[in-house]
Amino acid sequence: MPEGRRAVYLNPGLIFGTGSHGTTRLCLEGVERYVRPGDRVLDLGTGSGILAIAALLLGAEQAVGCDIDPKAARVAAENASYNGVEGRFQVYTGDVNGDAELQQKLAGRYQVVLANIIADIIIPLTAAAGNYLAPGGTFLTSGIIDSRARDVAEALERNGFTIVETREREGWVSYAAQKK
């Protein structure tokens, strides 16, 4: 393993997020770039929890994940335990755009907000992501097929974000964006 890197141990079950898909790799590289020791991280659509767990292993103080799939929340919690970060990782089930109780649980500001989901979900999620972002924080998003990249970029801009980095791999796009 390259120096300075750490392994993330996973049992994804039937949940997305093993680290082998191009979108997950793009987001993991973004986590390496933008997460700093002591950060609070919010992972919207946490899946297996790989992104939040990686952030914790890189020094984030706390990570919170949420997913609409109860199985994903269970798998993410198990994976946090495999990696020894379960005490710093909370996982919730629900839709951040329509669940007031979940919105209260997620309340607070995060230095990094993650979303590795498809464009049709990211687009309406950009407003919520901005509400959780701390000043100077970064919204890292991937799962965007290149033919939908412009749509996501426009949604980010409409919701007060400036795209600070665009990365592409295998027909997928990832954005790092910050609030204006």
Which role fits each region the language model picked out?
Residues 1-3, 45-52, 98-99, 122-126:
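Short hydrophobic/aromatic-rich motifs at helix boundaries and adjacent loops
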